[in-house]
Amino acid sequence: MLDISRGRVPKLETLLDLAEHLADFKINELQLYTEHTFAYRNYKSVWQSWGALTGEEIRKLDTRCRELGIDLVPNQNSFGHLRYFLEHPKLKKLAEVSEPYEDGGDAATGNQEFVRRPSTLAPNHPGTLPFLRGLYDELLPNFSSDFFNVGCDETWDLGRGQSKRLCDARGKGRVYLDFLKRIHREVSARGKTMMFWGDIILKYPKLIRRLPKNVVALNWGYEANHPFAKEAAQFAKAKIPFYVCPGTSTWQTLIGRHDNALANLHAAAKAGKKSGAIGYLITDWGDGGHPQPLAISWPMFAAGAALGWNSKTFDERKLVPVLARDVFGDSKAAKAAFDLGFVHKKLGVKAINETPLGTVIAAPRPEDRELFCRNGLKWFAKIRRERVLGTFAEIEDLLRQAKLLSCSGSVLEMELNLAARMAAVSCMFMFWQQVAAVGNKIAMNCVGNLMVAELQKLDADFKAYWPQRNKATPKHCSAFLQWRMDDYRNCL
């Protein structure tokens, strides 16, 4: 499953090339995670600046996927994660909450406090289902698949606004389930089997048995220690068909967290086989603007394919040769793509769903900055200086060994260069914070000027690379490069 809703909407040519390679790895299902990036006729103002896939493009991709033995499954989030639809003047009334609010974070998951903007539909608003029907009637005819993933994960706003009284009276879990069933009826009426993310229903174990039996629950989790075994067993006990859904761990990292991903992919395969999962979905998310490119994800696509088919015979040592032969066409580039995913370990920081390399440079947009800096950046400045400098040196060394010092060559090589250089700037920023903290203005100005110069080069190279892979412009993906330039200039 490829995220196409956080900043990168791939061109049809990119997706066709992706499908060819996925087929080489015996991957037989592809989903494109969609919030607002299908070209719905009535909502051009929602998707236009992001780019969107058209019905014609989907039909062409669907045809080629069928020829390759891949089921292209439609994917449209239908409850939460609909922020950009709910900012549309005619759709604001469908939002559960009308204003942004500060989320207190979650100690269990490691999520920091930050601002949430309205993103969840009000299940009790009379216009909600007609809105979804309109999306489904336009989207689904473009797919030949018998399945449809309606999402419905992370409904953060539920019970905070329009449905508060209903949730207080009936319980949030029951309100969620009732709306999920209403969506299920819409999907069934269109001849599809409904898939949905299982995170919310798992919070209400007693309600799992009340799910319709002809659905597929998607049991997702992305950390090495995610309790797939426990969660999968709950769906199995209730006789609900389910997939296990691990991830590539590339999002909010720039260059990967391959150590975590390998453990996560393996745990999902093991638990899925034991509990009778009917599928294994490798997810590749784009949180934080999706700055990480496909080149960073390919090592874990390959690892996930191997583990999904037979975890007992998986041999990590074979990944680089296979990637060199089938994806990169070059052993040095393949090795760099694999090795970069372990560089973050040198910082000595264990974080959930991110690394400092990804989060430092891609910090939030200006309106969210104050809250993020108050709560989310504190520990970056505490990383030991020698670890930061060592990490920077290792990134530079890997680029040098792979002869990837310039943004040239194949598209995959360009992507490795850009991702690694952005990670290197994150190291520079951490070092800049450290010298600033001790009042070393000479070093602070020197490093700051170097960062601004490198960010300017990155911005130009990113814009030159972008149209080779993606639709629209990179403004939703690489805007943080300009934000960081402004930050540093203001401090020099």
Predicted segment positions?
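Feature activates predominantly on carbohydrate-active enzymes
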Residues: 1-175, 181-188, 195, 244-246, ...
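Substrate-binding groove of N-acetylhexosamine-processing glycoside hydrolases
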Residues: 20, 56, 60-63, 69, ...
